[in-house]
Amino acid sequence: MKTVIALSYILCLTFGQDLPGNDNSTATLCLGHHAVPNGTIVKTITDDQIEVTNATELVQSSSTGKICNNPHRILDGRACTLIDALLGDPHCDVFQNETWDLFVERSNAFSNCYPYDIPDYASLRSLVASSGTLEFITEGFTWTGVTQNGGSSACKRGPANGFFSRLNWLTKSESAYPVLNVTMPNNDNFDKLYIWGVHHPSTNQEQTNLYVQASGRVTVSTRRSQQTIIPNIGSRPWVRGQPGRISIYWTIVKPGDVLVINSNGNLIAPRGYFKMRTGKSSIMRSDAPIDTCISECITPNGSIPNDKPFQNVNKITYGACPKYVKQNTLKLATGMRNVPEKQTRGLFGAIAGFIENGWEGMIDGWYGFRHQNSEGTGQAADLKSTQAAIDQINRKLNRVIEKTNEKFHQIEKEFSEVEGRIQDLEKYVEDTKIDLWSYNAELLVALENQHTIDLADSEMNKLFEKTRRQLRENAEDMGNGCFKIYHKCDNACIESIRNGTYDHDIYRDEALNNRFQIKGVELKSGYKDWILWISFAISCLLLCVVLLGFIMWACQRGNIRCNICI
């Protein structure tokens, strides 16, 4: 029994002694990446829910609630529509010769002159809006044998009866209304817009009282077009005390062309022309207030920032705006895959690298080093690899924004009732475009997220391989993102590994010597178990030998008798 105890004691001393390499002749260096306690969930091509350390929202879902007047010139229509300002409604005289980038029509706008209709209202409104100006030049039309400057009680200009300032209502003179034939050439180098009209009396009596003839006719032509309008006499619902109507028409005269007006009654003549300009001006219906601020993108809800590639505030936009999509949120990964640190591990109680988990303590970089040596423990970020990853992700975000921000505007579209099928088709096309863009946006973000995560992992692997190439045979890969360095490596040595100036030849002999010594006697976790089992088996064997020897000795002395029966 004393022999067994003695052998067990010897084995314990053997396996419990300090091993070579447990002293200050080695060090441990781990590589890791940033982690946060609670990451952000994003979508990738392969995974609908993957956690990353950081993500940027790509969808602008709110407006400022006000329209910024810079850098775009905003013209507030207040109580006037653009067409009323164009025609010269008395309460819209303040808009004469105005210019704009965006004309804002309000919901409380109203007409306050003779009731009218425009058969092609939407086209005229869009044409004038895109021109961006109400610059008007009066021309010397000669209307012989008729009375000019007709007025109406429905169109007061002060206390007196008035009319649209840009139109000239012609009526009979001394019971006569001769046939009018007037020409006006365009000798300038720009397009001219002429606005004219036809009066529709409510009764035959009113027709003859104003124009003598029982039925008038108006023909306006150029070399490229001709319009002939016959008045429709008949009573209509009373508007501002008038049962009659005026139909407004328009003609564009190109440079070198000529305008010809022929009529024997019912003509609402032009007083001149509007100078047409080419540009990207527009019009928008909105009740948002106009404020002094700066914004490139305007919607009916108000201005919105254009630092995001997508928005779901409004389909109608003006300026350099994010693309409209249906989604309320699309998150672009701007950080790496998040693997929260195991809190039970402790900082260096069992130091581990990026293969096991991330590090939550790194605030100055995405990638870094942790070490454990004779001088203690430490941590430092690797700024070069961090900056390389950040630069690529920032370029990616800027490319997405640049590709999707529109440098034009999505205008409002209006259709008359007879164009209902066209309106339905237009709506279908717009809805289809939005569906496609929404799908493309989600796919684009998922692809970019996948690439970002792969990129971040790649930078981590590059840093690990760079460190491995530096250390060579002086260290061993521990399989968890760490290296066991087989030579004394103080803080200066660790720093040289981090900054790429480490010279493995200096430490080569020491590392090889320590590696052989440690490998000769080092007990790794797997071998310790085997040796413990072997020592236990030897102890049991020795115990059995001693017990068997005791039995044989006792039998020889006669103290024990053994009977074998067959």
UniProtKB/Swiss-Prot annotation:
Cystine bridges: 30-482, 68-293, 80-92, 113-155, 297-321, 489-493
Name recorded for this polypeptide: Hemagglutinin
Domain of life of the organism encoding this protein: Viruses
Gene3D superfamilies: 3.90.20.10, 3.90.209.20
Subcellular location as annotated: Virion membrane; Host apical cell membrane
The record's account of how the chain is modified after translation: Palmitoylated.
Primary location: virion
